[in-house]
Amino acid sequence: MKILIADKVHPSAISGLENLGHEVTLNPACTSNELHKYLTGVEVLVVRSTRVVAETISKANSLELIIRAGAGTDTIDVEAASSQGIYVCNIPGKNAVAVAELTFGLLLAIDRRIADGVIDLREGIWNKK
């Protein structure tokens, strides 16, 4: 299976797909406007934040699956893909640990009034209380 990854992904994801016998092309510099140029013969497209619009989908001659490597599919024209018989899926929940870490970090920042301290420091105030 020919796979195009149009955004940055961890190298282990690429090697894992290659070990399964897939032909993987990595092109993280590809923009939404030029994406259609790289889709010739591609069966699976993997994106993170690159937009996949109806015009791009209509030019994909062998595309069968679009994978959004993240939560949501808001960067993909799902209706256009469906009308072409192309499946669209996402990978929700992979960022759950990072979200939990951020939440606890923000709770600590609120509890310790870090933002208030930063504002004071920028104004030249050193309040030791």
Task: Please name every model-derived segment.
Residues 84, 92-129:
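Phosphate-binding beta-alpha-beta segment of Rossmann-like dinucleotide-binding domains, i.e.
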